[in-house]
């Protein structure tokens, strides 16, 4: 947990833009911020500590892009919370949505609750109106949700 995803996103961040990074665990957040400040100092990155479902509503953001890679069992809740805030044409990216390919193997879905949750999230996202959903079989799976209007 060194902020690698944040560093990758920051590398392509347009001038005048900002990046908000949330971490639930205070100790991990402190280590990440320390590593980040030593290796990637930037005023474009704002750090927030706390549970995302609690912190996000307080930020008053209208993002173009949201990257979700934690708290997998709440992916649907993050989608419900962030989609109304997302600008039209904005994208949400959810990581690990093939769950080591178990999501596509029916016998694995039957026996593993985490796999069932991830499968349910993908089905839920795909059924939403006014979005375009793409599940990409890259590494552990990426689900992209684009807000159409």
Task: Name the predicted role of every residue range.
Residues 1-149:
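S-adenosylmethionine/decaboxylated-SAM
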């Amino acid at each position: 947990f060194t902020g690698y995803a944040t560093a990758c996103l920051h590398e392509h961040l347009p001038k005048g833009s900002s990046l908000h990074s949330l971490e639930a665990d205070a100790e991990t957040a402190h280590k990440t911020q320390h590593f980040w400040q030593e290796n990637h100092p930037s005023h474009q990155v704002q750090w927030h500590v706390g549970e995302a479902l609690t912190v996000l509503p307080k930020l008053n953001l209208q993002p173009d892009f949201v990257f979700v890679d934690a708290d997998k069992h709440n992916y649907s809740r993050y989608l419900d919370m962030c989609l109304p805030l997302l600008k039209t044409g904005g994208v949400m990216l959810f990581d690990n949505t093939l769950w080591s390919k178990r999501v596509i193997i029916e016998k694995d879905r039957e026996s593993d609750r985490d796999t069932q949750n991830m499968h349910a999230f993908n089905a839920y996202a795909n059924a939403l109106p006014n979005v375009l959903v793409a599940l990409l079989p890259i590494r552990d799976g990426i689900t992209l949700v684009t807000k159409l209007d």
